């Protein structure tokens, strides 16, 4: 049944240190993502002084980071390995959100958001590639579904928490997101230790 297959995916995920850690990182990163992005339109208006057109330009500028991230992810992983590429990307996510929480300059905010999206693309590509190499082919769909559930729960939690924090200070969700990503970077260094890339290639 569907539930039995889902349970099998969860059990396998929980029993594998690296893939389970990637799922945990994905859930936490989803919280960190939704903390600022659940209130980004309000942040852009109240903190950056942007109207609807300006907000659109801000998002368009941030998308450039995604293009850059897709271009550099594979070379970075080949040079640094999955562990340090993922950790560095998550650290960049933390730094970009910390800067965004402090700035009131729309141009600086656009650059920081582009760096944030760059981190998200690099982290996602590396994590997905590593997971696909480590999970047996017959379990890939079930384990992937279990990981997506963890991420969806993180999105829901981050959205609710972001809205609650914004009622006291509009920049607070962004700062909280930076803290979450800093924790994710530290967790990645610890949890992905060992020859994870050689294990994936085996």
Language-model features: where?
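Conserved aromatic/hydrophobic "specificity hotspots" at molecular recognition or selectivity sites
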Residues: 1-2
């Amino acid at each position: 049944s569907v539930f039995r297959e889902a349970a099998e995916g969860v059990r396998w995920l929980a029993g594998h240190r690296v893939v389970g850690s990637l799922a945990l990182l994905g859930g936490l990163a989803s919280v960190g993502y939704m903390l600022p992005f659940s209130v980004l339109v309000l942040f852009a208006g109240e903190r950056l002084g942007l109207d609807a057109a300006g907000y659109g330009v801000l998002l368009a500028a941030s998308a450039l980071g995604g293009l850059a991230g897709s271009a550099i992810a594979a070379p970075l992983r080949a040079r640094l390995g999955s562990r340090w590429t993922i950790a560095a990307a998550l650290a960049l996510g933390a730094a970009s959100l910390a800067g965004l929480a402090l700035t009131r300059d729309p141009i600086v905010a656009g650059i920081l958001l582009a760096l944030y999206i760059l981190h998200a693309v690099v982290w996602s590509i590396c994590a997905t590639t590593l997971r696909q190499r480590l999970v047996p082919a017959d379990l890939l769909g079930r384990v992937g579904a279990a990981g997506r559930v963890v991420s969806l729960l993180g999105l829901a939690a981050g959205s609710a928490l972001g809205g609650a924090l914004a009622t006291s200070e509009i920049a607070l969700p962004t700062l909280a997101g930076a803290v979450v990503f800093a924790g994710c970077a530290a967790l990645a260094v610890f949890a992905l230790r060992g020859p994870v890339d050689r294990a994936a290639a085996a």
